[in-house]
C-alpha cells in the first residue's frame, strides 16, 4: 500500500531512503495536484536537508519524466543526441552546435529555455529573429528534425509537467540549490525529449551559478551518474566561465556572433574550443566518431564546407524565420539606437572581469528579465568584448554598449569599465575545458 504524502515527507525528513514506488506515487500526486503545495514544499526542504542517493534520484527523474509526454524518434533510425548547459554569460554555443552536429549525421532535437538570472537564454536569442516560432506543433517539430537534422524549440506544456510544479515551489522555498532536485529537474526534461545520448556543459566561475569547484564537480557527477542510471549515455565537461564565452552578450548580438562563427570567423577563440569540444563528444556519444579527435575533424569539416550554416538557415526558415536570414541578417536583426565605447581606464593587460555583473548589466539595459512577464529588448547588449589577456592602452575600446538611448548607454558604460581589472603583467591563461566527467 502506498504511503501517505506526509509519511513520505517524514521518511525523507528523518534521513530515510525512499523506494521507487514511494517516489512514483508522490510524483503522481505532484503532477495531478492531489498533493498540496505545502506538502511539496516540505518534501523539497526534507530533500534539501537529507539528500538522495543515486537510486532515489534516478527514480525521481524517471517519475517526473513519465508525468507527461515522452518523444519517440525510433522511426527515424538515426542517433538522437543533445547538449545541456547550466548557464553562463555570452554562451550561445547551442545555436552553432545543433547544426554542426546535425550536419555530421545525428539528429539534435534541442528543447531549450529562457534566460535565468544573469544568464542569457537560447530561446530569447532565437526570438530576435523575426518570425522564429519557438512553439511549433509536435508534428512540425518532428518534420523539421527529420528534414534538417536539428530544431531548437521551447518546452511544451506536456513535457515533464511534474517538474514545472516542483520547480515553481522550489523557487520560493529556498530549495533551488538542492543537487538531487537540480539533477532531476534538468534530466527529467531532457529524458522526456527521447534522447539516446547527452553531453552536459557544467559551468564553473564567476559568471556561472556555481562558483565553487567542489560543488560544481558534485553537480556534474550527480548529473552524469543519474542520467546513465536512467539509461541515457551521458558525460559532462566542466568549462570555465570567468569571462564571457562569446565576444558579445545580448540576444540579437549573440545571433550575429553565431552567424560569424558559422562563416568561420571565430576560429581559435575560447568559444571555438567549447563548440568543437562538445561537437566532438556528441559525435563520439552518437557512435559517429571513434574518438574526440575524429569527432572534431568531422565537426570542422561541417563548418568549413558550409553545411552547418545551410542547416541553420533551413532550421530558421522552417520555424518561421526569413528564408534569406543568414545572407541578410543585418536587414532583419534590429539595431540598438545608441552605441558607445567602453574605454580602458589605463595601459596594461585585461586581467580579470566580473562576469556575472556583465550579465546583469545587459539585464539593466533591457536585454533580460527581472520578472517572468518582462518584455525583452533584443537589440541591446555588449559587443566587441576583448578577451582576458589582451594588452590595451588607456582609452582603447574594451567593449561597446548597445542601448535603447544615449543616456542609458553612458550609464552602463561607466559601470562596465569598473568590472574589468587591468594589470601590468599578462595574467596566466586558464583552460576553457576544465575537466571531463564520465
From Swiss-Prot:
Report the SS bond pairs: none
Pfam families noted in UniProt: Glycos_trans_3N (PF02885), Glycos_transf_3 (PF00591), PYNP_C (PF07831)
Identify the enzyme class.
Answer: transferase
- MF terms per GO, please? 1,4-alpha-oligoglucan phosphorylase activity; thymidine phosphorylase activity
Superkingdom to which the source organism belongs = Bacteria
Its cellular-component GO annotations read: cytosol
| Sorted UniProt keywords | Glycosyltransferase, Transferase
Q: In which pathway does it act?
A: Pyrimidine metabolism; dTMP biosynthesis via salvage pathway; dTMP from thymine: step 1/2
Q: Which Gene3D superfamilies match?
A: Nucleoside phosphorylase/phosphoribosyltransferase catalytic domain, Pyrimidine nucleoside phosphorylase-like, C-terminal domain, Transferase, Pyrimidine Nucleoside Phosphorylase, Chain C
E.C. numbers: 2.4.2.4
Q: Do you know which InterPro entries this protein is assigned to? A: Glycosyl_Trfase_fam3 (IPR000312), Glycosyl_Trfase_fam3_N_dom (IPR017459), Glycosyl_Trfase_fam3_N_dom_sf (IPR036320), Nuc_phospho_transferase (IPR035902), PYNP-like_C_sf (IPR036566), PYNP_C (IPR013102), Pyrmidine_PPas_bac/euk (IPR018090), Pyrmidine_PPase_CS (IPR017872)
Recorded catalytic reaction(s): these are: thymidine + phosphate = 2-deoxy-alpha-D-ribose 1-phosphate + thymine
Swiss-Prot/TrEMBL GO biological process terms:
pyrimidine nucleobase metabolic process; thymidine metabolic process
User: What protein family does this chain belong to?
Assistant: Belongs to the thymidine/pyrimidine-nucleoside phosphorylase family.
Quaternary context: Homodimer.
> What function is annotated for this protein?
The enzymes which catalyze the reversible phosphorolysis of pyrimidine nucleosides are involved in the degradation of these compounds and in their utilization as carbon and energy sources, or in the rescue of pyrimidine bases for nucleotide synthesis.
The name on file for this protein is: Thymidine phosphorylase
Q: Please name the gene that encodes this protein.
A: deoA
Amino acid at each position: 500500500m502506498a504511503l501517505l504524502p506526509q509519511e513520505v515527507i517524514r521518511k525523507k525528513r528523518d534521513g530515510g531512503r525512499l523506494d521507487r514506488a514511494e517516489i512514483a506515487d508522490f510524483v503522481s500526486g505532484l503532477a495531478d495536484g492531489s498533493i498540496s503545495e505545502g506538502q511539496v514544499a516540505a518534501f523539497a526542504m526534507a530533500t534539501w536537508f537529507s539528500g538522495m542517493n543515486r537510486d532515489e534520484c534516478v527514480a525521481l527523474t524517471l517519475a517526473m519524466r513519465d508525468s507527461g509526454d515522452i518523444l519517440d524518434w525510433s522511426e527515424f533510425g538515426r542517433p538522437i543526441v543533445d547538449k545541456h548547459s547550466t548557464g553562463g554569460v555570452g554562451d550561445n554555443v547551442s545555436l552553432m552546435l545543433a547544426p554542426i552536429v546535425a550536419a555530421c549525421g545525428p539528429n539534435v532535437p534541442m528543447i531549450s529555455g529562457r534566460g535565468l538570472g544573469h544568464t542569457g537564454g537560447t530561446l530569447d536569442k532565437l526570438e530576435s529573429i523575426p518570425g522564429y516560432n519557438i512553439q511549433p506543433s509536435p508534428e512540425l517539430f518532428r518534420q523539421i528534425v527529420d528534414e534538417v537534422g536539428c530544431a531548437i524549440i521551447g518546452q511544451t506544456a506536456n513535457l515533464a509537467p511534474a517538474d514545472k510544479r516542483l520547480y515553481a515551489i522550489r523557487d520560493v522555498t529556498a530549495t533551488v540549490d538542492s543537487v538531487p532536485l537540480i539533477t532531476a529537474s534538468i534530466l527529467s526534461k531532457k529524458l522526456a525529449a527521447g534522447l539516446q545520448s547527452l553531453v552536459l556543459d557544467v559551468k564553473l566561475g564567476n559568471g556561472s551559478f556555481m562558483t565553487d569547484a567542489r560543488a560544481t564537480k558534485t553537480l556534474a557527477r550527480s548529473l552524469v551518474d543519474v542520467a546513465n542510471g536512467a539509461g541515457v549515455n551521458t558525460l559532462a565537461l566542466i568549462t570555465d566561465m570567468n569571462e564571457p564565452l562569446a565576444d558579445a552578450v545580448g540576444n540579437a548580438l549573440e545571433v550575429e556572433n553565431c552567424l560569424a562563427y558559422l562563416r568561420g570567423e571565430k576560429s581559435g577563440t575560447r568559444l571555438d574550443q567549447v563548440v568543437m569540444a562538445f561537437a566532438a563528444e556528441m559525435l563520439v556519444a552518437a557512435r559517429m566518431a571513434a574518438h574526440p579527435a575524429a569527432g572534431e575533424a568531422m565537426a570542422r569539416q561541417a563548418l568549413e564546407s558550409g553545411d552547418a550554416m545551410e542547416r541553420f538557415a533551413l532550421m530558421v526558415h522552417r520555424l518561421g524565420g526569413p528564408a534569406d536570414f543568414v545572407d541578410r541578417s543585418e536587414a532583419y536583426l534590429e539595431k540598438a539606437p545608441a552605441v558607445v565605447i567602453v574605454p580602458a581606464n589605463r595601459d596594461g593587460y585585461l586581467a580579470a572581469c566580473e562576469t556575472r555583473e556583465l550579465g546583469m548589466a545587459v539585464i539593466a539595459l533591457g536585454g533580460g528579465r527581472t520578472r517572468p512577464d518582462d518584455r525583452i529588448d533584443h537589440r541591446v547588449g555588449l559587443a566587441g568584448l576583448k578577451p582576458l589577456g589582451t594588452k590595451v592602452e588607456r582609452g582603447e575600446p574594451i567593449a561597446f554598449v548597445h542601448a535603447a538611448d544615449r543616456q542609458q548607454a553612458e550609464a552602463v558604460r561607466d559601470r562596465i569599465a569598473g568590472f574589468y581589472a587591468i594589470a601590468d603583467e599578462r595574467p596566466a591563461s586558464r583552460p576553457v575545458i576544465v575537466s571531463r566527467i564520465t
